[in-house]
């Protein structure tokens, strides 16, 4: 189910404050965050945000095409390494 249009998009308060501070200073700096549920808003465009994937922080450069998506969509949490090989020969 999508979020109601009456509500604003969710952005973590600490993340919003950091971005607004960098926008007023006109600086570019990597912002480290664990907030994967935060929605990307237009004020984030041009910033690099390091999003936690459960193991490490992946730096993601925010572009205008990402607006409206969640931060967690761009930091995959699992790596699929393929299915186990068939060991029928070794069992015989």
UniProtKB/Swiss-Prot annotation:
User: What InterPro entries does the record point to?
Assistant: Ribosomal_uS19, Ribosomal_uS19_bac-type, Ribosomal_uS19_CS, Ribosomal_uS19_SF
Q: Which family does it belong to?
A: Belongs to the universal ribosomal protein uS19 family.
Q: What does this protein do?
A: Protein S19 forms a complex with S13 that binds strongly to the 16S ribosomal RNA.
In the record, biological process GO terms are: ribosomal small subunit assembly; translation
Q: Which GO terms describe its cellular component?
A: chloroplast; mitochondrial small ribosomal subunit
Keyword Chloroplast attached: yes
Please state what the protein is called. Small ribosomal subunit protein uS19c
Q: Which GO terms describe its molecular function?
A: rRNA binding; structural constituent of ribosome
Keywords on record: Chloroplast, Plastid, Ribonucleoprotein, Ribosomal protein, RNA-binding, rRNA-binding
Localization terms from the record: Plastid, Chloroplast
């Amino acid at each position: 189910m999508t979020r109601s249009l009456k509500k604003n998009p969710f952005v973590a308060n600490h993340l919003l404050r950091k971005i607004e501070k960098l926008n007023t200073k006109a600086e570019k700096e990597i912002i480290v965050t664990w907030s994967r549920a935060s929605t990307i808003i237009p004020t984030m465009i041009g910033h690099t945000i390091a999003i936690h994937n459960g193991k490490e922080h992946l730096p993601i450069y925010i572009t205008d095409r990402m607006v409206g998506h969640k931060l967690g969509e761009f930091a995959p949490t699992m790596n699929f390494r393929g299915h186990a090989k068939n060991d029928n020969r070794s069992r015989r």
